[in-house]
Design a protein with these regions (language model features):
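Short coil-to-helix segment of the ABC ATPase nucleotide-binding domain corresponding to the Q-loop/switch region
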Residues: 26-37
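The N-cap/first-turn positions of alpha helices
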Residues: 13-16, 30
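ABC transporter nucleotide-binding domain catalytic core, centered on the Walker B motif
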Residues: 3, 38, 74
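Hydrophobic residues on short alpha-helical segments
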Residues: 17-18, 34, 54
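DNA-binding patch around the recognition helix
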Residues: 8, 53-82
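A structural micro-motif at secondary-structure boundaries
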Residues: 1-14, 41, 79-82
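Short helix-capping/hinge SLiMs at alpha-helix to coil transitions
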Residues: 22-25, 40
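Residues within helix-turn-helix
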Residues: 31, 47, 54
Length: 82
């Protein structure tokens, strides 16, 4: 839920949001996110994380272009502020 709205998340979006929520306030690198959400045997591009972050922002941010919940930490990764 986001306020009174029920969010419709895809399974991987849910896993990503859950993982980030469990590490609120911590900077998480793409590699760490990939390992914990997609698994150590994931074959693909780390930009997969960026795409899923963008999809989540579109669903949970009031203004996805100026996010307040999922923050990009330039050169490091992402931080979830809740």
């Amino acid at each position: 839920r986001l306020g009174s709205d029920v969010l419709q998340l895809k399974p991987k979006e849910y896993e990503l949001l859950l993982y980030m929520g469990q590490h609120k306030g911590q900077v998480l690198t793409r590699e760490v996110i990939l390992e914990h959400v997609w698994g150590w045997d994931f074959v693909g591009d780390s930009r997969t994380v960026d795409v899923h972050i963008r999809w989540l922002r579109e669903k949970i941010e009031q203004n996805p272009e100026s996010p307040q919940r999922i923050i990009t930490v330039r050169g490091a990764g992402y931080r979830f502020e809740g």
